[in-house]
Every structure is written in structure tokens, then in C-alpha cells.
Amino acid sequence: VGGLAADWLKPIYEQIRTGVMAGGYVQVDETPIDYLEPGNGKTRQGYLWTGSRPQADVFFHWETSRATACLDNVIPATFTGTIQCDGYAAYRAFANGRGQTITLAGCWAHVRRKFYEARESSPRLAGWWPNQIQQL
């Protein structure tokens, strides 16, 4: 992605991303989005990665995949701290590649969702846990 508008907006984007990363804690997620591949006339699946920090800004980053290498473009090499994310293996591989500089924290919304899914097979037990998580 490039062009005149992108060139003008890049310093603003980088400032927002720097601010989000400055706190040593960031929430990261990737969302699949179908996009029209230029010159092909067909749609493909890409990913809109988000980085956010409570009571701070949010930034968005576009990638055509959700590979571990994409996180190098989302998380600056200078970042140290905690990344809150889902259980997708790319986050673990990314953190392991950075040594001891990154700690992963799970996402309660994803944990809670799994208990809702388990309600069909074990409604009494699985139904109790979402209420406990909500109290947190």
C-alpha cells in the first residue's frame, strides 16, 4: 500500500503506534477480511491486525496473512512488555523469538467464549464459569 496519502499519513500512524506501545502492555488481535486482489478480479483473505491499550489509542495494520512474521510489522522491535492475545500459535512463536522481552497474557473474552461453546455438552459446569469470569 502506498501513494501520496499513505506517505502523508505514515508519520501520524507511527506516532499512534508508538503511543500504544509505550506503556509496555498491548492488546493484539487479527481479524480476517476478504479483499479484492488488484488485477485478479478475485477476492482473497487478508487480515486487519489491531493493537490497543486501555484508555489509549488503537492502531490498525493490514497484512495478507496471519503468519508469525506479520507480527514483526505490528510490534516494533523495541517493544518489551506484555502482549494480551488469543491462543493463536503465532503469538507464542513470536514471543519465543524475542527471548525474555515479551510476556503473553491470555484474553478472557476468548476463554469465556470456550465455556459458552461447552454449555451444550456440560451445561451445569460450563454455565458456572462465564459468570465467574464476568466478575473479574
Question: At which residue positions do the language-model features occur?
Answer:
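Catalytic center-proximal scaffold of phosphoryl-transfer enzymes
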Residues: 1-136
